[in-house]
Design a protein with these regions (language model features):
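Solenoid-like repeat scaffolds
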Residues: 187-196
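Helix-turn-helix repeat elements of alpha-solenoid scaffolds
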Residues: 171-187
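Small-residue-rich helix-interface/hinge motifs
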Residues: 17-81
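Topogenic membrane-insertion module of multi-pass membrane proteins
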Residues: 1-20
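Membrane-interface elements of multi-pass transporters and channels
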Residues: 7-11, 37-49, 111-118, 139-143
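Generic helix N-cap/helix-start motif at coil->alpha-helix transitions
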Residues: 161-164, 195-201
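Hydrophobic transmembrane alpha-helical segments that form the core helix bundle
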Residues: 82-172
Length: 201
C-alpha cells in the first residue's frame, strides 16, 4: 500500500510537470504563430514554424531536429526587393509575436479567473512573460522583437544593413542558384562586421 501510494503521488507530480511543459510549448507556438500570421498578412512568404518538438512547413509537418529551435522560431522572407516595403512588412512580422502573446495572455487570465481554471491562468501568465521578454528592446545573443521594431523605426547604417540581410535571406530561400544572387547583396554580406546580428535574424 505504501508503494502504491508513493507511485500515485509520483504519477501526479509527473502529470503536473507534463501539463506545464505542454503549456510552455503552447506558449512558444502562439508567439511564433503571431509572427507567421502578421508576416503573411504583410505580404511575406512563409517557410516554417518550429515550437517544441514540431516543425510546420508549407506542405508538411515534421519532427523538430534542432534543440536550438525548441523555444520557437518562425521563418518568413520578403517577396519584394523594395527596402521601404520590406521595412514596413518586417515591422509587422516582428510585432506579430508579442501582439498575439499579449492578446492570449489577457484572454487566458480573464477566462481562467472567472471560471477558476488554474491551468488557463498559467497559460496567461506564461504568455504575458513571453510578451515582456520579447517586446522590451534589448540586444543579447539575439535581438528581441522590440529591438528589431525599434531599429526599423530608426534611420542609419544599422537599419540598412539589417534590411540588406533580409534581402539576402530572400535570395537564399529562393530556387535561384548562388551564382544568380545579387552581387551587391553578397558584397555587403562579405564586408559586414562579423557578429551575432549579421549571422542571425
Amino acid at each position: 500500500l505504501i508503494l502504491a501510494f508513493q507511485f500515485t503521488e509520483y504519477a501526479g507530480t509527473m502529470r503536473e510537470i507534463g501539463l506545464l511543459v505542454l503549456l510552455a510549448i503552447s506558449t512558444f507556438f502562439i508567439h511564433e504563430l503571431g509572427h507567421v500570421v502578421f508576416g503573411i498578412v504583410a505580404g511575406y512568404q512563409f517557410h516554417f514554424l518550429t515550437a517544441g518538438p514540431i516543425t510546420i512547413e508549407r506542405n508538411r509537418i515534421t519532427a523538430n531536429s534542432s534543440w536550438a529551435y525548441f523555444g520557437g522560431i518562425a521563418s518568413c522572407s520578403p517577396k519584394t526587393d523594395d527596402l521601404q516595403k520590406i521595412s514596413r512588412q518586417h515591422f509587422l512580422f516582428a510585432a506579430g509575436g508579442p501582439i498575439l502573446s499579449i492578446v492570449v495572455a489577457i484572454l487566458s487570465l480573464t477566462v481562467g479567473y472567472f471560471f477558476n481554471l488554474q491551468y488557463v491562468q498559467f497559460l496567461g501568465v506564461m504568455n504575458f512573460v513571453i510578451f515582456l521578454v520579447t517586446a522590451i528592446p534589448f540586444k543579447g545573443e539575439f535581438k528581441s522583437d522590440g529591438r528589431v521594431m525599434l531599429e526599423l523605426l530608426s534611420k542609419g547604417n544599422e537599419k540598412e544593413q539589417f534590411l540588406s540581410t533580409l534581402l539576402l535571406i530572400k535570395e537564399m530561400m529562393s530556387p535561384a542558384l548562388p551564382n544568380m544572387w545579387s552581387l551587391h547583396l553578397v558584397q555587403q554580406a562579405r564586408t559586414a562586421p562579423v557578429n551575432e546580428d549579421n549571422i542571425t535574424v
